[in-house]
């Protein structure tokens, strides 16, 4: 087994390794046909320590988000419950990827034949990662629908999005995504699974784009209608628009971090022997790093966009003996 194949194992996902393994074969074929033998065909190596470090950072950040939302009753709203679901999904994707890197590195450093055990561990962790990816997509869609209701059905919103209903939605999301993730890994040898994942990703983008075009085109009209009513409708509507903008940023980061991976899958099933596709697929490990970066960036977005969340973060952090961090100015 050559070194590049060992490096490819750090990416691990059984479903995703399948495309990585195919990459080496296709690269060899391309080289055999006379193409340049530049480093573009070599699988990009990323140190396992990078995966582990990002996994630990993501774990700490997203736990902080979950604890903050649970602790502060002012954050007990549908949007933040969906954000909590997204934080759990982000954390599982990043931590599972880092954990699998550790497991494979340890197994590769031993002389014993642990191939069967490695495959079983891969399947379990890959199921978690796949389920979490689906949950991330569904959570983002749920937040988008929630923002849509707050803007277009502001007066009926609290009757539509009750805490009980939100809890049922989140439970159904995770139940469906868990079953789907397990099935995807079981049938990961089929190209239909990859096509299904790619279709889900791009369908999500189309739905989001359609929703936001309608949302922002009509938002001003609804703001004007709410403004003529007594009370604090204008203030409430402004807060709702801020939430919609926050979601826009989250979706933008999600697309930037996940699109290269889905393009990798798309190229694998559409042009696996094309030298340009092979060159793009040789950076597979980098695309996994981008995925883990998404889990690290999202909590920072929550904090930057929510003063209430920043305040709760500080209260939680100051609970621990972290030196003079509590002496920082109250203003962010």
Curated annotation (Swiss-Prot):
The chain crosses the membrane at residues 44-69, 82-106, 124-145, 166-186, 192-215, 249-271, 281-304. It is found in: Cell membrane. PROSITE patterns: G_PROTEIN_RECEP_F1_1 (PS00237), G_PROTEIN_RECEP_F1_2 (PS50262). The keyword Glycoprotein applies. Pfam families: 7tm_1 (PF00001). It is a multi-pass membrane protein. Brain, enriched in the striatum, nucleus accumbens, and periaqueductal gray. One of its GO terms (cellular component) is plasma membrane. Glycans are attached at residues 2, 17, 26. Belongs to the G-protein coupled receptor 1 family. Homodimer; disulfide-linked, also forms higher order oligomers. Interacts with GNAS. Interacts with ATRNL1. Interacts with MGRN1; this interaction competes with GNAS-binding and thus inhibits agonist-induced cAMP production. Interacts with MRAP and MRAP2; these associated factors increase ligand-sensitivity and generation of cAMP. Hormone receptor that acts as a key component of the leptin-melanocortin pathway at the intersection of homeostatic maintenance of energetic state. Plays a role in regulating food intake: activation by a stimulating hormone such as anorexigenic alpha-melanocyte stimulating hormone (alpha-MSH) inhibits appetite, whereas binding to a natural antagonist like Agouti-related protein/AGRP promotes appetite. G-protein-coupled receptor that activates conventional Galphas signaling leading to induction of anorexogenic signaling in the hypothalamus to result in negative energy balance. This is Melanocortin receptor 4.
């Amino acid at each position: 087994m050559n070194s590049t194949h060992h490096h490819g194992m750090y990416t691990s996902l059984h479903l995703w390794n399948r495309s990585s393994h195919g990459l080496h074969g296709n690269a060899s074929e391309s080289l055999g046909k006379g193409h340049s033998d530049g480093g573009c065909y070599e699988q990009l190596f990323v140190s396992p320590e990078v995966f582990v470090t990002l996994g630990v950072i993501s774990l700490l950040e997203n736990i902080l988000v979950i604890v903050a939302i649970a602790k502060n009753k002012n954050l007990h709203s549908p949007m933040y419950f969906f954000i909590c679901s997204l934080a759990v999904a982000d954390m599982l994707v990043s931590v599972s990827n880092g954990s699998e890197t550790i497991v494979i590195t340890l197994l590769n450093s031993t002389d014993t034949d642990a191939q069967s055990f490695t495959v079983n561990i891969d399947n379990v962790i890959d199921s978690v990662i796949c389920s979490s990816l689906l949950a991330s997509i569904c959570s983002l869609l749920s937040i988008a629908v929630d923002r849509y209701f707050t803007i277009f059905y502001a007066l009926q919103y609290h009757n539509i999005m009750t805490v009980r209903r939100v809890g049922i939605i989140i439970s159904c999301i995770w139940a469906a995504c868990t079953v789907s993730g397990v099935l995807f890994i079981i049938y990961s040898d089929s190209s239909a699974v990859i096509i299904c994942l790619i279709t889900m990703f791009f369908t999500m983008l189309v739905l989001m784009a359609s929703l936001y075009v309608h949302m922002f085109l009509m938002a001003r009209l609804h703001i004007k209608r709410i403004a003529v009513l007594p009370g604090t409708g204008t203030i409430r509507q402004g807060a709702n628009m801020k939430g919609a903008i926050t979601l826009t940023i989250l979706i933008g980061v999600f697309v930037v971090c996940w699109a290269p991976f889905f393009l990798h899958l798309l190229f694998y099933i559409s042009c696996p022997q094309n030298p340009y596709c092979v060159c793009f697929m040789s950076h597979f490990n980098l695309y996994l790093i981008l995925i883990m970066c998404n889990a690290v960036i999202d909590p920072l977005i929550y904090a930057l966009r929510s003063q209430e969340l920043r305040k709760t973060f500080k209260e939680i952090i100051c609970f621990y003996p972290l030196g003079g961090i509590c002496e920082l100015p109250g203003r962010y």
